[in-house]
Amino acid sequence: MPSTNPFLTLPYEPAFASLGSEFSDPVEAATFPAHQLRFRNDRLLPILGLDPATVADEHFIEAFGRFQGRSPLLAMRYHGYQFGIYSPDLGDGRGFLYGQVRGRNGWLYDFGTKGSGRTPYSRGGDGKPTLKGGVREVLASEFLQRLGVRTGRCLSLIETGEELWRGDEPSPTRSSVMVRFNRTHIRFGTFERLHYFKRADLVRQLLDHVIATYYSHLLGDPEADAKFYAELTERTADLAAQWMAAGFCHAVLNTDNLSIVGESFDYGPWAFLDRFDPKFTAAYFDHSGRYRYENQPGICQLNLELLQVPLGMVMSAADLEAGIAGFGDRYQATYSRLMLRRLGFEADQLHSAIADDLIITTLQLLLRAPIGYNEFFARLRAQFQPSWRSDLSAILPDWITTDLEALPEAQWQGWRDRYHQLLTHLPESQLPLIQQQLAQANPEISPIRPVVESVWDPIAIDDNWEPLEALLNRWRHDGDGAADGAVVPNAN
């Protein structure tokens, strides 16, 4: 047995538990027939003051597979609007809050499980996710982290040796348990549940807790409540813009899946765009397309409006309306800035009308171009040359005879003319900065569905984890290299 488990000696704080029994239920973790550590996110350990070299695989398994040494384990209570219909029959159905630890940066972080067994909110389910679902979450969260999108992360993924039967993937399939590393698991739906039971006192208690814990810069401000909601609106608008620029479709933007700190979490049937299709819907069960790609900003704003109902028990309507009023402008400004970065430019380099025109022209091109959304930006990164500034014909020359030959020439030429015009308006000294920006904003490969399957199939067929490790390594060493967990294919 390795030395004292560092996860069990962390200075856990009972921040959420201190709210009392109205907010959660104590539960017991499931036991599993086997434990194989498949992924450990060593990048997160220094945030906790831990040296990855001193943390053994068995430490992960003991803490996050056998769940030894922690009590209480809390299933959090919440409600939510699911596909527009209010559901009071929700809560942590296959996970719990393992503990909360303050990082070296002073922030409080949650260890939240997924797949740790039944709770009072399992609604007849077995409380266990598939291994493929765990691998998909690793891919989504690490890629979004690579892009600079606010996201929870996977701290560990452990295969648990059971066979599961699921209707949405070939069965029997393999089981897993995951520990997520998030700023918080408090959701819009956490507040909605309190309104459902007409508990204004608990809304006040929870709001005070959220401000003190996650918006502490507002403590002591007489307008803290109003400023909290306005800042949450900004964070949520920023998050929606980050998703849209990344070509990411969350798939299930119910109010119980939106974080009170504006962080991506609760990954389900997510997908990244292959071809640019604004009406793309990621979830096979979203028959109406409610949560399709193009709807995400509007849904985020709608969910903020729904959050006004419980917050309105302790806040004025005027403060709430003022807080959400800036959503559209904030979203558009962030989206434009991020899209310009994907094209190699900073917003302050260009007049806003010129910048917007380039973005619109790019999206119009991608609507008809036989090329993937993220592939377009990756190719722009790979082929950009400073010579484009002086030679219009040098801009992506191979496209004319290959991918773009099916496009009307005027459409392709229109995009190329605009891009060239912007280059000529910039000093030549800024061209290397464009190359740097393109590299930072555009990974060489994105986890579109064929890529996900190319990673999963070797695992499913041959227990071969090398393709997953190779893909994570590409993101790890590409651009800023933000994604850097470690695949552990043969841990016992």
Curated annotation (Swiss-Prot):
It comes from the Bacteria. Its cofactor is Mg(2+); Mn(2+). Its EC number is 2.7.7.-, 2.7.7.108. It is an enzyme of class 2 (transferase). Keywords: ATP-binding, Magnesium, Manganese, Metal-binding, Nucleotide-binding, Nucleotidyltransferase, Transferase. It catalyses: L-seryl-[protein] + ATP = 3-O-(5'-adenylyl)-L-seryl-[protein] + diphosphate; L-threonyl-[protein] + ATP = 3-O-(5'-adenylyl)-L-threonyl-[protein] + diphosphate; L-tyrosyl-[protein] + ATP = O-(5'-adenylyl)-L-tyrosyl-[protein] + diphosphate; L-histidyl-[protein] + UTP = N(tele)-(5'-uridylyl)-L-histidyl-[protein] + diphosphate. Coiled coil: none annotated. ATP binds at G91, G93, R94, K114, D126, G127, R180, R187, D266. GO terms for molecular function: AMPylase activity; ATP binding; magnesium ion binding. Pfam families: SelO. The keyword Ribosomal protein does not apply. Mg(2+) binds at N257, D266. The active site is at D256 (proton acceptor). Nucleotidyltransferase involved in the post-translational modification of proteins. It can catalyze the addition of adenosine monophosphate (AMP) or uridine monophosphate (UMP) to a protein, resulting in modifications known as AMPylation and UMPylation. Belongs to the SELO family. HAMAP family: YdiU_SelO. This is Protein nucleotidyltransferase YdiU. The lineage of its organism: Bacteria, Bacillati, Cyanobacteriota, Cyanophyceae, Synechococcales. The gene is ydiU.
